[in-house]
UniProtKB/Swiss-Prot annotation:
Salivary chemokine-binding protein which binds to host chemokines CXCL1, CXCL2, CXCL3, CXCL4, CXCL5, CXCL6, CXCL7, CXCL10 and CXCL11. GO terms for cellular component: extracellular region. Keywords: Disulfide bond, Glycoprotein, Secreted, Signal. Residues 1-25 form the signal peptide. It is found in: Secreted. This is Evasin P1126. Disulfide bonds join C46-C62, C50-C64, C58-C75.
Length: 90
């Protein structure tokens, strides 16, 4: 009788572990809490580039964005972004 109980517990454990593995291995679908279709962040490229190391900056209203170790960056107008500021604002 003891072996019968052990087999039942082992089968239950295998099914439980398999269920947990299946649930964790599937990608979770994240839903937006904000149902609006308007984007709060709408970056537009400005017609210029920037090189901060040579003190070549973007015009007013545009922000310099560099990728990795590149010397030259692209200027973007960040419409609708209220979190931009200089590091000294912290």
């Amino acid at each position: 009788m003891t072996s019968h109980s052990a087999v039942r517990i082992a089968i239950f454990a295998v099914i439980a572990l398999h269920s947990i593995f299946e649930c964790l291995s599937k990608p979770q679908i994240l839903q937006r809490t904000d149902k609006s279709t308007d984007s709060e962040w709408d970056p537009q490229t400005c017609p210029e580039t920037c090189i901060p190391s040579k003190n070549i900056t973007c015009s007013d209203g545009c922000v310099c964005v560099k990728l990795g170790e590149e010397e030259e960056g692209t200027c973007f107008n960040m419409t609708g972004v209220d979190w931009l500021g200089s590091p000294s604002d912290d």
